[in-house]
From Swiss-Prot:
Belongs to the PAL/histidase family. It comes from the Bacteria. Gene3D superfamilies: Fumarase/aspartase (Central domain) (1.20.200.10), Fumarase/aspartase (N-terminal domain) (1.10.275.10). There is a cross-link at A145-G147 (5-imidazolinone (Ala-Gly)). This is Histidine ammonia-lyase. NCBIfam families: hutH, PRK09367.1. One of its GO terms (biological process) is L-histidine catabolic process to glutamate and formate. Keywords: Cytoplasm, Histidine metabolism, Lyase. Pfam families: Lyase_aromatic. InterPro entries: Aromatic_Lyase, Fumarase/histidase_N, HutH, L-Aspartase-like, Phe/His_NH3-lyase_AS. The modification 2,3-didehydroalanine (Ser) is found at S146. It comes from Vibrio vulnificus (strain YJ016).
Length: 513
């Protein structure tokens, strides 16, 4: 993938741009049209200091200490202190791509001109992104209100020459990180530390990654599901547009259309049993548009929410320069992100659950009319028997991980922050769930290809044959038992590359052009 050259117009990021940011390094610049609003907001903060007004976050303490007035000579220390004291995360570091996405989201939010932060601070973040220097940010420690304080504090420590960063996979000090980007440590002005820390950008970055994973899984599950229909000699009748039109759910209709797109009438396998006496297929084949359509709807709903959040201002307090006003609110509360992530979790779990059932159908000779466990000479060969057990284990894990996180809340900051979103965990677990579902789909991919080979000399449709050939270039037909795990890994690697997206109809998925 070529490096994305992105000129940022604040508040105008698209989902496709965000997908690219999450997948590869970028060259980022700020559109000149953003500069006046940024400068206007910093001038409001400067007037507050000059006029000795009391404003939260500028010359007061934070959280429960909001009523504590800070002396003028301590204002810069206050901003440095909030960054260092709030960098209290724990656990493994976020992946570089997650940090890059989080930084771009933060730059986008700050550049809208409602945060009272100077242009040179924003430019430092841009320079770090362009130098591929990514702060080391622990994954755990945020409850998603007041924003993602700990993760964003760890991101911000590097601006001070503190903390750690990663460059080309190597962990370096914050001071070394700045040198690589051609920067010097900065002294934060009033409001700037709080502006950097307040916001939903860590949760949103995790959730966006979950969205992109869910989209890729949806595409692969649709392709693998269509392959399984062919391998099991399933009927095409359940994908008839009339069925889905009378129910009326747009995403169900679109899902059925995708199956018709893959299972076109040129399939020799389909023609070979067009006059068979079987009346109905099991639900895992027949109800794919209904189940996958519901998953697609959750993906689309979540995409809409996350696109808005990606372009939002989630700082507090907010600076309204045109009114010379600064207002405390609660845009840092990540409840929309948490609920979107919970819905993505449901979709990811269901995509995997349905795939596991299709694979189980294929290895059951009574249902699929294929050799038991998809291998000849059964008894001597166990075939795909234990691969299905692996799928079942992964599907079961996802059922537990899919439990909604947004229904939980624990009060923090001496009950000043008495309801929180848990958005960071809600979004962070999506990667693990996605890995589980990808593993399930890898097993189905192998199984469906094996089943299709047993239908030779008949061929499927061109797109299904293309999907099978992608796999067969990496994994050969199973004529007898062999070491299975490497083949699952090869199939998994293909799915991770989103190889099936090109086989899907255009404009089906929100971030895939």
């Amino acid at each position: 993938m070529d490096m994305l050259n992105l000129t940022l117009k604040p508040g105008c990021l698209s989902l496709n741009q965000l997908r690219q940011v999450s997948r590869s390094p970028i060259n980022l610049s700020l559109d000149a049209s953003a500069i006046p609003a940024i400068e206007d907001s910093t001038q409001v903060v400067e007037r507050v200091i000059a006029e000795d007004r009391t404003v939260y976050g500028i010359n007061t303490g934070f959280g429960l200490l909001a009523n504590t007035r800070i002396a003028p000579e301590d204002l810069e220390t206050l901003q440095r202190s909030i960054v260092l004291s709030h960098a209290a995360g724990i656990g493994e570091f976020m992946a570089d791509e997650t940090v890059r996405l989080m930084m771009v989201l933060k730059i986008n939010s700050l550049s809208r001109g409602y945060s009272g932060i100077r242009l040179n601070v924003i430019q430092m973040l841009i320079d770090l992104v362009n130098a591929q220097v990514y702060p080391c940010v622990p994954q755990k420690g945020s409850v998603g209100a007041s924003g993602d304080l700990a993760p964003l504090a760890h991101m911000s420590t590097v601006l001070l020459g503190e903390g750690q960063a990663r460059h080309n996979g190597k962990i370096i000090s914050g001071l070394e990180a700045l040198k690589i980007a051609g920067l010097e440590p900065i002294t934060l002005a009033p409001k700037e530390g709080l502006a950097l820390l307040n916001g939903t950008q860590a949760s949103t970055a995790f959730a966006l990654e979950g969205l992109f994973i869910a989209e890729d899984l949806f595409a692969s599950a649709t392709v693998c599901g269509a392959m399984s229909v062919e391998a099991a000699l399933g009927s095409r009748r359940p994908f008839d547009p009339r069925i889905h039109r009378v129910r009326g759910h747009r995403s169900q209709m679109d899902s059925a259309m995708a199956y018709r797109h893959l299972l076109d009438t040129s399939s020799e396998i389909g023609q070979s049993h067009s006059n068979c006496e079987k009346v109905q297929d099991p639900y895992s084949l027949r109800c794919q548009p209904q189940v996958m359509g519901a998953c697609l709807q959750q993906i689309r709903n979540s995409a809409e929410i996350l696109l808005v959040e990606s372009n939002s201002v989630s700082d507090n307090p907010l600076v309204f320069a045109e009114d010379d006003d600064i207002i405390s609110g609660g845009n840092f509360h990540a409840e929309p992100v948490a609920m979107a992530a919970d819905n993505l979790a449901l979709a990811i779990a269901e995509i995997g659950s349905l795939s596991e059932r299709r694979m189980a159908l294929l290895i059951d000779s009574a249902l699929s009319k294929l050799p038991p466990f998809l291998v000849d000479n059964g008894g001597v060969n166990s075939g795909f028997m234990i691969a299905q057990v692996t799928s079942a284990a992964l599907a079961s894990e996802n059922k537990t991980l899919a439990h909604p996180a947004s229904v939980d809340s624990l009060p923090t900051s001496a009950n000043q922050e008495d309801h929180v979103s848990m958005a960071t965990f809600a979004a962070r677990r999506l990667r693990e769930m996605g890995e589980n579902t990808r593993g399930i789909l890898a097993v189905e991919y192998l199984s469906a290809a094996q089943g299709l080979d047993f239908r030779a000399p008949h061929k499927s449709s061109p797109r299904i044959e293309q999907a099978k050939q992608m796999l067969r270039e990496k994994v050969s037909f199973y004529d007898k038992d062999r070491y299975f795990a490497p083949d699952i890994e090869k199939a998994n690697s293909l799915l991770k590359l989103a190889v099936h997206n090109v086989l899907m109809p255009e404009a089906l998925l929100p971030s895939v052009l």
